[in-house]
Every structure is written in structure tokens, then in C-alpha cells.
Amino acid sequence: MIFASKKKFIKPRRYKRCYVVTKRVLDNIPVGALGIIALDGCQEMGKRVNDYIVNWRREDSHEFKNDVVFKGYERDNYLIDAKVPRFGSGEAKGIIGESVRGKDLYLMVDVCNYNLTYSLSGHTNHMSPDDHFQNLKRVIAAVGGKGRRINVIMPFLYESRQHKRSGRESLDCALALQELVRMGVDNIITFDAHDPRVQNAIPLSGFETVRPTYHL
């Protein structure tokens, strides 16, 4: 009972159990809607991953599948349109064709795909690992910090063979990892890293190296 005055009593109303979704609740959700960005050279693999997740989530009886808090859990497509066009000078820029605000983004890049080419000054150039890594950074820059989390899937770890210094040499792999983390990358997933200890360059960030032999 709640006292409204000395003479009158107001009986509290009983409400049915309900869930009120507020901005604070949404901010406390540990995950965001899934978004997959497959860069050039990794689009076929990205499509296969997307198709698998679409079918899996469609058949999955997730308890909160239709909950507004988990909006976007089940969709027909998780791929996000992203492009890296080049200017006549050979320079490039990253473009994302849709909103990625609040999404968990997974960027897939194959730095050893040499089949991709681009034209420069009338010559055809094959893309090097450096070109692929720069394109990855361009797409991350296009996200602009609006994604909830950024995860990079890089089957072959960029500059992984330059993991230690033998004389007056640059530590390219460590610098690349630190650069990605500074740009807002939360997790880096690779396969069979040349030396997994390179993760010491980013001890406070996620780094996963999957050994193919384990799954074979």
C-alpha cells in the first residue's frame, strides 16, 4: 500500500510482466548484429561463409531469435557491400555501401591472392600483400569507428615471416598488428601463424591462430 494522503489510500496497480528495451539495455548487450565484409580476392569464400550462416541460423531455434534486442540475428544476407576503387594515380579509397553502426564486423582478407590486378599508367599490376593490407586499412577507416566490434580474418598472417629481428631489420608483423589495433580492431584470426608469439606485440587484444592439423 502507498500512502497518498492521511485519509486516502492508493492501491498499486499490477502490471503484466514485460521487458522494456532502453538504450542502456542495448548498450549492455555484449554482441551486435553480424556483418561480413569480404575484400577483393576473398569474396568467394565470404559467400560460402555467408550461405552457411544463413542456413544455420534459419534452422536454429534460438530462444531470442525474435527478440527486439537481438534484431538482425536471422537475415537473408550478412554480406556488406564494400569496395576499394582506384584513382588514375594508382591510389585508392575504401567505400562501404550501407550502414554498419552497432554491428559486429568480420573482415576477410587474403593477402596472398596475386591473381587480382589493377591498371596503372597503362601497365597491369598484380596486387601484392602490401596492396591487400592497405585495402584492409582503407575499409576499416571507412567504418569510421561506428561498428560495435571489428574482427579481422586473415588466413595468411601479413608479414608473419618477419616476426623477429636478426640484425638491423624492421619488425613488420608486430607493427602491422599494432597498427590494426590502433585503428580499432578487437580480434585478429589467422591460420597456422609462422610464430604465434608475435601476439606479444598486442597483448591486450584478441589474437587467435588456428592450426589446420587440429581439424584434420
Question: What are these model-predicted stretches?
Answer:
Residues M1-L216:
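PRPP-associated nucleotide enzymes
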